[in-house]
Swiss-Prot record:
Ceramides bind to ORMDL3 N-terminus and stabilize it in a conformation that physically restricts the accessibility of the substrates to their binding sites in the serine palmitoyltransferase (SPT) complex, hence inhibiting SPT catalytic activity. In the absence of ceramides, the N-terminus is flexible and permits substrate binding, thus liberating SPT from inhibition. Belongs to the ORM family. It comes from Bos taurus. Ceramide-sensitive subunit of the serine palmitoyltransferase (SPT) complex, which is also composed of SPTLC1, SPTLC2/3 and SPTSSA/B. Keywords: Endoplasmic reticulum, Membrane, Transmembrane, Transmembrane helix. It holds the Pfam family ORMDL. The chain crosses the membrane at residues 27-46, 47-64, 101-121, 124-140. This is ORM1-like protein 1. It comes from the Eukaryota. It is a multi-pass membrane protein. One of its GO terms (biological process) is intracellular sphingolipid homeostasis. InterPro entries: ORMDL.
Length: 153
């Protein structure tokens, strides 16, 4: 019997997206962002959808693909220090339910934004560029790859 020993993950970043209610909270946060943008009087519906998509994807890129390391003191001897949150997610195992959810969610938001903007060329280009900026880093072939040495250290 291990008395006084905490039963937790070596790196809490690996399982935080699998927590109870995390996906629901994520979806509610995106919905709340959209409602706030719709409540601004001078934003039309297409502008609100495009801004929802772009802000969501910008936040996803920053928090999952740009920020490296972990906010916790981990006993892994610095292994997580050089990994992005996406690379730490589910211990780097590809095609888990969390990774699928966070890959599908920007695609669904993209389809909604494209539909409600009536496929306007300007909105379509912005939404497509925003989508590609978060989908390309999620590809399994780019796990641990730093293009042009960006975000290497």
């Amino acid at each position: 019997m291990n008395v006084g020993v905490a039963h937790s993950e070596v790196n809490p970043n690996t399982r935080v997206m699998n927590s109870r209610g995390m996906w629901l909270t994520y979806a509610l946060g995106v919905g709340l962002l959209h409602i706030v943008l719709l409540s601004i009087p001078f934003f039309s519906v297409p502008v609100a959808w495009t801004l929802t998509n772009v802000i969501h994807n910008l936040g996803m890129y920053v928090f999952l693909h740009a920020v490296k390391g972990t906010p916790f003191e981990t006993p892994d001897q610095g292994k997580a220090r050089l990994l992005t949150h996406w690379e730490q997610l589910d211990y780097g195992v590809q095609f888990t339910s969390s990774r699928k959810f966070f890959t599908i969610s920007p695609i669904i938001l993209y389809f909604l934004a494209s539909f409600y903007t009536k496929y306007d060329t300007t909105h379509f280009i912005l939404n497509t560029a925003s989508l590609l900026s978060v989908l390309i880093p999620k590809m399994p072939q780019l796990h641990g790859v730093r293009i042009f040495g960006i975000n290497k250290y």
